[in-house]
């Protein structure tokens, strides 16, 4: 499917970003704690895996074709965004004395937990991409199997931790793992499966059946809700970010959005990404501003008012990023390539050394040596 018909992905970025803000603000706490749990602890957990799966939709097919050549630029962009976001939250970290922790704790935050509570997304995406690249390179079409096993390991350290805690040897193993990271919701356990899921769906034959996929999404949401309520009823969760039915929901969500064949909306990409990055700062600003103007009751104590204020401020501060476009290459520009004659002579010598006694190379120069100059290259080859 052409990228310009995947506007459904762009449009769902906004609800996904708003769900992330909801997780960190609890918009329905003043109305109904139960409804808030449904929204933030169950349905809201679709948001970040959706972002991972969309990244996988575009990245994994390229990893299969190009290998490390596709991984490098992706890591560079992801880690640059992580660095800039970490610098943005450095003042809050200094205020909270977070950086006063031990070196081991700081490394754990940088590589797994994120340097601020929502920034775990960036190291998780980078680490998950590296794992997926290794799995695709080493196992090909079987790359999904270790990813599923990793997710199950993560699941037993998250929503289904109650089962783990009931088995002392297993609990001891997880307690050892939690010395390295605070949660199994990280790039090692939770990210690879969603990247591969997105990549696998991208390479499937496209079927324009939005109604069918919508039914599948609805049923999978029912299963997710039932699982989440079961986990809460039996108090099984150590943290509630991973569910067994979550990949099913995300898969049907991507299929449904892709089947809608909506035009691309690139402005939403930068805007929603900025909302994601900026909203914790906006939580701090709303709380501080409400105290200054005497509106704490409306903008902090009232959960809906607090959520609305944070969303509005985040959306406004993120608005410039909706208009940002990377600079395009000048169509009038010229490209060139330099041929190292010494390297060509070295390669010819090395190939000649592999030939049996009396054998000779017979170079074929075509298409003007692909723009390098047929006469010049022929002279070197015959020399």
Predicted regions and their residues:
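Alpha-helical transmembrane segments and their immediate juxtamembrane cytosolic regions
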Residues: 1-332
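A charged N-terminal "starter" segment
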Residues: 330-383
